[in-house]
């Protein structure tokens, strides 16, 4: 009897469960549920992929399999860079001092006083140039040189595909967490720049050509940010190579010390080849953005007090300063993280005791491990800028340089 009751209860439970499952399946099969679930899933997958960064990189000419389109977009971006540098030079040294046919486009707000400036001494003329105009000139020069150097490095990296970490390899090895972080930063700066342009066009009514010129100014800055994101993508792939090297070393059973050294040597060749290919951009970008970041931070408060007329000026100066600070500091930390990961691998190998290695592994003998650690330390494997390995000390030094602007202003 008890068994019959249990069987009946089990049938009743199975019936209820089947009805619930049918109800849930009917709800899930409804068009509204499928549409919302599919949309959320596609949005999640899109946000965890490199579609945004790859699209922006194609748009600014940094990354495109078709060389013709890549060269065309690069020419457009570099033309804008040169134009804004010329505009900054013109506004700083000619507007209000000399009268030319370009004044109506280049000098919308400058007062013309050309008659009194033809015979003044050069030092007096330079003394009359405002600091904010020099600041703009230095910033556009840094953007032009940085973008040009990155174009050059990406174009020439194809010649070293055997050992170098190219964008294609880095793109295929990137994980979801990296894409989420890069997409968040990219969308944050992108939307902030778009808000700045929309705000400007709604607030200030001027000539169409002037508004268009200011609106297109976000493209060079976006290209500079994109180069930093692509550099982060490459350095992340370099760190993955270190992880793979460490795993290969640990699994090298029944091998000799020379075999382990060859594995590590191949890793160093990959890192050195990639860092040498990016060396022109990294050196130019680091130096010029350091100068720009220090000047912007040092002059930001004073510029706001003297020139700001509302919330737009505060938003613009703060956003541009944040962009230059990020573009200067972030690549330094990316480069230092590669060297730090190499040192961490050696530290973890050194902390492994003899009994943790397999019997056939050469590092089962502590003497062999000590010889390898000594060899690896002399190789100084890590991200190199010239003959200098860029480690964590340089990253902190970059942060100190960025903070020097605040110190200069306080003093």
Where in this protein do the model-derived segments appear?
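Short intrinsically disordered, low-complexity coil segments enriched in acidic
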Residues: 1-2, 174
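Terminal membrane-anchoring module of integral membrane proteins
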Residues: 3-83, 258-411
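Short, isolated positions within intrinsically disordered regulatory regions of eukaryotic proteins
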Residues: 67, 109, 156-159, 183, ...
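Helix-loop-helix junctions within predominantly alpha-helical proteins
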Residues: 81, 85-146, 159-230, 243, ...
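Inner-leaflet juxtamembrane helices
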Residues: 147-164, 228-244, 324-355
